[in-house]
Amino acid sequence: NWGYPSRALRTKDFLYIKNFRPERWPAGDPCAINNKGELEAMHSAYHDIDACPSWDFIVSNRDDREIYPYFLKAAGKRPYEELYDISSDPGCLHNLVGNGKCTEKLTNLRKEMDKLLKKTKDTRYLDNPAQDDIWETYPRLSGAIRTFPAPLF
């Protein structure tokens, strides 16, 4: 039931993403706990992806080497930072963080992101750690609370 906090900055040629909680599942937890308190099957949840035949196919065939990359892109955990050259990689398939050729671009986009978060008083801004998890403290106003296994961290 936790959110997946991330912020993104896009320029003409690049997309920079900062994932503030990379230990979380961006598509929701992979399995849930049912009403009897029993752990459901792995890959039976991902409640932040709407049910549809294409997702059912990807989950059912995730062990296929050709399908697995799509499964990871849809449901896999993300690194703390992502950088994509959207002019040459519009599908954002190749994360350039760690690519020595993009160090200067990454540094500049980090600075721009920090300036923007500070200017907009974003609660995820690093200078305000007391507000970092404020979103986790608000009560849920509608809908059932689902139960998931405790995180392993």
What function would you assign to each model-found segment?
Residues 59-81, 86-153:
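Long, internal low-complexity/basic segments
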Residues 1-82:
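C-terminal cap/loop subdomain of S1 sulfatases and analogous C-terminal strand-loop tails that border
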